[in-house]
Amino acid sequence: MEIYIVGGAVRDRLLGLPVKDRDWVVVGSTPDEMLAQGYRPVGKDFPVFLHPETQEEYALARTERKIAKGYHGFTFHTSPEVTLEEDLARRDLTINAIAEAADGSLTDPYGGQEDLKAGVLRHVSEAFAEDPVRILRLARFAARFDFAVAPETMALMRRMVDDGEADALVAERVWQELAKGLMEDKPSRMFLTLRECGALARILPEVDALFGVPQRADHHPEIDCGDHVMRVLDYAAAAGQPLAVRFAALGHDLGKALTPAKVLPRHIGHEEGGIAPLAELCRRLRVPNDCRDLAHITMVHHTKVHRALELRPDTVLRLLKDCDALRRPERFLQMLDACLADTRGRLGFERAPYPQKDYLQAQLAATLQIDAGAIAAGCADKAAIPATIDAARTAVIAKCKEEWKED
């Protein structure tokens, strides 16, 4: 029995990054031998065991063969005769196909160390094409490490897309990988990589459709809608925003892809126009409710937020109510963060002032000070309660607006 650390733990150590999880491969052993040594079986599809003390995963060396479309369509073979090199050959990328022995020596039959030094993502073998999830994983690694994709690997991914492999991806796995990619330091790299190989049009056609759509150069010097959305997304990432804000950044301008050509580069009504494509995207990928709902209110209301300083007090109150800000203040503040990213995700506007965020935060705080219950209790005419509460809220908003002007 020979035991090696493999995959991401070796890769990250060589890159000088923290090692979070360690995966192990066991060469020359059998399930019975693993059980006899106290390992606990957990693998449903192939022999994986938990170490009796560390609870880390140990997998028997194996080979794989594709028998059907999709990432479930595999059969595997494991035996004491399967070599370490054969096990590494089934892995996706050269940088993930390096093994480390107990003495620290490395087995790197596919040049992973050289690709790490060069900053290149390269497939190990043509078997890469057998698992469409690998397209998403590679794009995610591009976002994490800001590595280039080897030309031959990009060509292989294009062939996979052309062969319909991307269409075999199931919604849960697509969202799982997209969510991880959104949380990387440079999430735009994931989407641009997917677009380059053609997978974005298959997985997220609503986002892909934004590329090539022009905007007014005076508002958007970057002009291209797709370029803008990528900048917004990267700004949100650089600010350390949570997943829901990053997803809202990705989806806030989907309606611009539907603007009639004769109207371009203006995008009148794109806020409402994006509701249907966003809903379809979220339905198809089974996007979590918190991400879906924040993206929706950001899409519908972001231009009103940008104009916040111009809005009448009653319009500010309507904005707060339409966003359910009085019951969900934390979500409203997240929307403001997405709107800030929208403003600064423009060429040359990366440090633009955005007082709208502080202004609306102050308006929300002032409005929340109104005791609606006390007003209702003191209102003799029950039918007048809503209007009386709104009047009180509008009054504090007006006062806050005047104080803001004075400051």
Swiss-Prot record:
The gene is cca. Gene3D superfamilies: Beta Polymerase, domain 2 (3.30.460.10), cca-adding enzyme, domain 2 (1.10.3090.10). CDD domains: HDc, NT_ClassII-CCAase. This is Multifunctional CCA protein. Residues 225-326 form the HD domain. Mg(2+) binds at D21, D23. Belongs to the tRNA nucleotidyltransferase/poly(A) polymerase family. Bacterial CCA-adding enzyme type 1 subfamily. Catalyzes the addition and repair of the essential 3'-terminal CCA sequence in tRNAs without using a nucleic acid template. Adds these three nucleotides in the order of C, C, and A to the tRNA nucleotide-73, using CTP and ATP as substrates and producing inorganic pyrophosphate. tRNA 3'-terminal CCA addition is required both for tRNA processing and repair. Also involved in tRNA surveillance by mediating tandem CCA addition to generate a CCACCA at the 3' terminus of unstable tRNAs. While stable tRNAs receive only 3'-terminal CCA, unstable tRNAs are marked with CCACCA and rapidly degraded. ATP binds at G8, R11, R91, R137, R140. Comprises two domains: an N-terminal domain containing the nucleotidyltransferase activity and a C-terminal HD domain associated with both phosphodiesterase and phosphatase activities. Its EC number is 2.7.7.72, 3.1.3.-, 3.1.4.-. The lineage of its organism: Bacteria, Pseudomonadati, Pseudomonadota, Betaproteobacteria, Neisseriales. It catalyses: a tRNA precursor + 2 CTP + ATP = a tRNA with a 3' CCA end + 3 diphosphate; a tRNA with a 3' CCA end + 2 CTP + ATP = a tRNA with a 3' CCACCA end + 3 diphosphate. One of its GO terms (molecular function) is tRNA binding. Its cofactor is Mg(2+); Ni(2+). Magnesium is required for nucleotidyltransferase activity. Nickel for phosphatase activity. A single active site specifically recognizes both ATP and CTP and is responsible for their addition. CTP binds at G8, R11, R91, R137, R140. Keywords: ATP-binding, Hydrolase, Magnesium, Metal-binding, Multifunctional enzyme, Nickel, Nucleotide-binding, Nucleotidyltransferase, RNA repair, RNA-binding, Transferase, tRNA processing. It comes from the Bacteria. Monomer. Can also form homodimers and oligomers. One of its GO terms (biological process) is RNA repair.
